[in-house]
Design a protein with these regions (language model features):
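A charged, well-structured terminal subsegment
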Residues: 123-161, 171-172, 176-191
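Short acidic active-site motifs
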Residues: 54-58, 79
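Glycine- and acidic-residue-enriched helix-capping/strand-helix junction motifs
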Residues: 13-27
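Extreme N-terminal starter segment of soluble prokaryotic enzymes
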Residues: 1-2
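Flexible, gly/pro- and Lys/Arg-enriched active-site loops
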Residues: 76, 81-136
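Short acidic/histidine-rich motifs immediately flanking catalytic phosphotransfer sites
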Residues: 62-69
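Short beta->alpha junction loops
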Residues: 43-53
């Protein structure tokens, strides 16, 4: 599951300063991210709050099922010390997104306290930045899944039971029982 988290004032997308943030609404953004992630078979849990505490609570509550986070922290980008700490506690990557180019705006917007806790940052591409963040996270997850074989029980070579003398009877301990093939030399190899 991908978490799509938007901070203060992003509920006003489409109304607030359209010359900076455009005319797309938060519903439009959520729909776009859901469509992008659906193409990879991933679900999206969207959340927006004007409260830093509510955002922290949401991230913590979903930390076990989250596979990635797309986060536009809004003005919390420049003020929150708790948000990057929370992101570092998550076992998944975060992509920080800003609709406008925060580095080309007022000097106080240039520093992101969140960026050091994020895997990447997308700024100044309008709401398309959300699409690119979703695409990147989904591709990362797909690549990881392709590299990671399904978990199978560990296979162990036969071992002598506890207390067996060298050259004595050889068996498998019950917890380590695995199927084996005997080759022409009589050696055992795991299947």
């Amino acid at each position: 599951m991908i978490l799509l988290v938007n901070g203060p004032n992003l509920n006003l997308l489409g109304e607030r300063e359209p010359e900076i943030y455009g005319s797309d609404t938060l519903d439009d953004v959520e729909r776009m991210v859901r469509e992008t992630c659906a193409g990879y078979g991933l679900e999206v849990e969207a959340f927006q709050s004007n409260s830093e505490g509510a955002i922290l609570d949401f991230l913590q509550e979903h930390r076990r099922e989250a596979q990635g986070v797309i986060l536009n922290p809004g003005a919390l980008t420049h003020t929150s010390r708790a948000l990057p700490d929370c992101l570092r506690a998550l076992p998944c990557p975060t992509i920080e997104v800003h609709i406008s180019n925060i580095h080309a705006r007022e000097p106080w917007r240039h520093e992101s306290l969140v960026a050091p806790a994020a895997a990447g940052q997308i700024v100044g591409l309008g709401v398309a930045g959300y699409h690119y963040a979703a695409q990147h996270l989904c591709a990362l997850l797909a690549a990881h899944a392709a590299r990671t074989p399904p978990r199978a029980p560990a296979r162990h070579a036969p071992t002598a039971p506890p207390g067996a003398a060298a050259g004595g009877e050889v068996g498998l301990e019950p917890a380590e029982a695995v199927p084996v093939d005997q080759n022409a030399r009589g050696d055992y190899e795991p299947m």
